Amino acid sequence: MTNLLWQKPGVAVDAKIQTFLAGDDVILDREFFLYDIAASKAHAQGLQHIGILSLEELGGLSEQLDLLADDFRSGAFVLDAHYEDCHSAIEARLTECLGDAGRKIHTGRSRNDQILVATRLWLKDKLQRVAALSTEVAKVALDRAQAEAELPVPGYTHIQRAVVSSAGMWWAGWAEAFIDNAVRANDTFKLVDTNPLGTAAGYGVNLPLDRAHTTAELGFARLQVSPIYAQLSRGKFELAALEALGGATLDLRRIAWDLSLFTSGEFAFVALPAQYTTGSSIMPNKRNPDVIELMRATHASVAAARTEIEQLLSLPSGYHRDLQSSKGAIVHGFARGLAALELLPALLANLEWRPDKLRSAIDSGMYATDVAVEAAVAGVPFRDAYKAAAAASDSAGQGRTPEGSLAARVSPGAAADLQLDVLRARWEALQ
């Protein structure tokens, strides 16, 4: 490994120690490399504004940074173990091509605020993707709730048959959940949309850095003012972003659980498209719902990433090398979470209900609540009506139909009044 920015003359670096220090940092930095380049361009512009760089030097740096970005995208430049991290790779390339101008690029900044700003830009993009996918899932669910509002579905509590419900209610529940997930991702975006570049190692520098320019140039909503807080926010903002992602993957896990049950032979309420299933290596008869099972497992990866960062943050103020480990947590957590969420809209759009199976699972006892409420409306104290309905639950369905039960469920949000217009207005507000 070459290009150690911190190496002192005459001090040897033990290879094993350096390998331990670097870990898989340079591989993870491939996620942040283009963001680091963008921030380096903005930083160079700020240095020119205060006279550290000439216009000619700025032009050369900007050109080389653009070329490096192009080479990285095309594969002509590979960020690998020749470098300690993405920061040293950028400085090495600029120094090789431009000499002194490349050696000036790090004036007024530290790798601490360098990775902070690159990570912050990366998190903003990831949160926008969480919001977009949550919005897309909500749209599918709203459309299907409208189309299948009157399709009877058995409602369960404790995984036991409970009351008559509808596909519309099932879909409306997920629509509202993912609208909230999009709102949460957008709110978290606003939290992290603050520029730490120019805070250096956490104590500022003796230069009048043009932080207002880098804030505007990089598209941040505001300046992160305190250098101390800039360091305190590392890990805190990553944790908030993972919590926003986790809200979506938690709901994904519960959808996947429903579908795991509903596609089983014991329920057989739902048929999945063939591309969402696999087979067995030994049992020719099997058609396994592996996609939804791995979707269900995804939240564990996101929760593990969140837990790792929570444990890392048992630190005093200031920068500590422990925080390097937060990179792997967010990269792996978001990779798993977004990969699963990407598949969800199409899966939901293409699953098929089996109306005959749904209807056959609605038994007489599932009308008992209707009987009790109707008696209460007629003047019988509800607790007495409840006891009478419980005693006669086996015959509660006589003369009743699932459609009749759904039509009577008029409380706001229930089957006869899904209030999809309210949910659609909330969805439209996300656009």
UniProtKB/Swiss-Prot annotation:
The keyword DNA repair does not apply. This is Argininosuccinate lyase. It catalyses: 2-(N(omega)-L-arginino)succinate = fumarate + L-arginine. Pathway: Amino-acid biosynthesis; L-arginine biosynthesis; L-arginine from L-ornithine and carbamoyl phosphate: step 3/3. Keywords: Amino-acid biosynthesis, Arginine biosynthesis, Cytoplasm, Lyase. Pfam families: Lyase_1. InterPro entries: Argininosuccinate_lyase (IPR009049), Fumarase/histidase_N (IPR024083), Fumarate_lyase_CS (IPR020557), Fumarate_lyase_fam (IPR000362), Fumarate_lyase_N (IPR022761), L-Aspartase-like (IPR008948). Belongs to the lyase 1 family. Argininosuccinate lyase subfamily. PANTHER family: ARGININOSUCCINATE LYASE. It is an enzyme of class 4 (lyase). One of its GO terms (cellular component) is cytosol. Its EC number is 4.3.2.1. GO terms for biological process: arginine biosynthetic process via ornithine; L-arginine biosynthetic process. Its main location: cytoplasm. It comes from Xanthomonas campestris pv. campestris (strain ATCC 33913 / DSM 3586 / NCPPB 528 / LMG 568 / P 25).
